[in-house]
């Protein structure tokens, strides 16, 4: 889903040519099972991503909320049964109590699985942050979202993108008045590489720790409009307390 805030001048979209590499946007096909914490949220179709943080809990974006979700793990090609998948239904879905669907502040959600998953080489957890990552840190973004800035091409194979954490000043300048201290920007101010619709809820992993959740942006891969992500390091206590209480 990545909450898409449409450009006012959609008709002028052709004035922004972007070099589409036919991936996440501008990314590459991940090596199979190289992102074992990546999950697909399914309600008869893939609609969002998420990250496995222990054998019974997944973290995603609150704007991905549905009352019933099947979590699919161990996936590479989401349209083919490859034999390594685990499909588990949700038992509890818990949005952050202060999630604001208008501003997308606190865009984080926890999903308790109906039963623990089997951890192996293809299904593994990602660590929560021990501290907030500084600007310039290189991160990996992944998902099965749209691979085009203009038009739609939803890939079968998991897509990856290497991108840096941007300075908060650049993030705020890109989206004046819209960036809270619970949001970070990751990507490229020049455009061309970004997450997109369908990547929502998925991971931004930096040095082995989950630092971001795909949240929103103006369009995808547009100049001066980098992707905006939930700042996971602000929520470690909430995550741990919520899991302990449930």
From Swiss-Prot:
Organism: Mus musculus (Mouse)
Stated name of the protein: Trypsin-4
Similarity-based family: Belongs to the peptidase S1 family.
Residue positions assigned to the propeptide: 16-23
Subcellular location: Secreted, Extracellular space
Activity regulation, free text: Activated by autocatalytic cleavage. Cleavage by CTRC inhibits autoactivation.
Record's keyword annotation contains Secreted: yes
Site note Cleavage, residues: 81-82, 122-123, 150-151, 193-194
Catalytic class of the enzyme: hydrolase
Function: Serine protease capable of autoactivation.
Domain Peptidase S1: 24-244
Keyword flag Transferase: no
Cofactor info, note text: Binds 1 Ca(2+) ion per subunit.
GO molecular function: metal ion binding; serine-type endopeptidase activity
InterPro entries to which the protein is assigned, alphabetical: Peptidase_S1_PA, Peptidase_S1_PA_chymotrypsin, Peptidase_S1A, Serine_Proteases_S1, Trypsin_dom, TRYPSIN_HIS, TRYPSIN_SER
